[in-house]
Regions:
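Conserved ABC ATPase signature
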Residues: 144-148, 152
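Catalytic Walker B motif of ABC-type/P-loop ATPase nucleotide-binding domains
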Residues: 169-172
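A short, proline-enriched helix->beta-strand linker immediately N-terminal to the Walker B motif
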Residues: 163-167
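Short coil-to-helix segment of the ABC ATPase nucleotide-binding domain corresponding to the Q-loop/switch region
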Residues: 103-111
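Conserved ABC transporter NBD signature motif
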Residues: 58-72
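ABC ATPase "signature
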Residues: 228-229
Length: 258
């Protein structure tokens, strides 16, 4: 059974239809990168997947837990208790870190497992320190977010998401708010998670990274999945003209900035 499955998701903001029947299925241990132009629907799809937005129509499930079914052409969401269970199955790392500024690094990582999952504090703190060490943040447990670089803050955000022991981890442009010099350290962390077969969906504009780390690449544009396949197929032999145009534009922009 798939860890995550969205079928025929539609979402409009007023008269603007942002998602036009998007379907995505992610298997355990799979790394899926979502690429595409700004305004193409990537972040909206991620927000619908993680219950930050509701779909107008379509279905959403995490394993056996159904978050939304479809009735009479509309999405009908599960009750509060069922959705709380669904939320325990995924983690989300935003582009803007969203750390609590008045909490130490350790408390940022430990807060949700203790307060939401009601886990033992000593056990959670020991796991959190091990996570921080693994992510290259040794000795930062008592620091506050303002004392960290952007790359360090994003790694704390990743540790916070992992501390909840999710079955799947979503990333929304995890490096877009970082100085280019700090981007590499965050990408290395995500790559290490991929090497450990963490199930992940990554919305990214980092094409070389998407190519290197992904099992599957999905090109989303105009609210629809235009093309998907292996990194080799999508980047080296795209089948759709829109995909070819997007990659050509990306390469031209990258060359101009080099």
């Amino acid at each position: 059974m798939a860890v995550f499955e969205m079928q025929n998701a539609r979402k409009a903001f007023g008269a603007l239809e942002v998602l036009k029947g998007v379907s995505l299925k992610v298997e355990k241990g799979e790394v899926v990168s979502i690429i595409g132009p700004s305004g193409g629907g990537k972040s909206t799809m991620l927000r619908c997947a993680t219950l930050l937005e509701t779909m107008d129509s379509g279905t959403l499930a995490y394993g056996e837990n159904v978050a939304a079914r479809e009735e009479n052409g509309k999405s009908v969401y599960a009750g509060k208790a069922a959705l709380a269970q669904v939320r325990r199955q995924f983690g989300l790392v935003f582009q803007q870190f969203d750390l609590f500024p008045h909490y130490t690094v350790l408390k940022n990582v430990c807060d949700a497992p203790i307060s939401v999952q009601k886990r033992d504090r000593a056990e959670v703190e020991a796991e959190a320190i091990a996570l921080l060490d693994k992510l290259g943040l040794q000795g930062k447990e008592n620091a506050y977010p303002y004392q960290l670089s952007g790359g360090q803050q994003q790694r704390v955000a990743i540790a916070r998401a992992l501390a909840m022991k999710p079955e799947i981890l979503f990333f929304d442009e995890p490096t877009s708010a970082l100085d280019p010099l700090l981007t590499g350290e965050v990408l290395r962390v995500i790559r290490s998670l991929a090497d450990e077969h963490m199930t992940m969906v990554i919305v990214t504009h980092e094409m070389p990274f998407a190519r290197a780390v992904s099992d599957r690449v999905v090109f989303l544009d105009g609210g629809v999945i235009v093309e998907q396949g292996s990194p080799e197929q999508v980047f080296e032999n795209p089948q759709q003209e829109r995909t070819r145009e997007f990659l050509k534009s990306y390469r031209e922009t990258s060359s101009a900035q080099a």
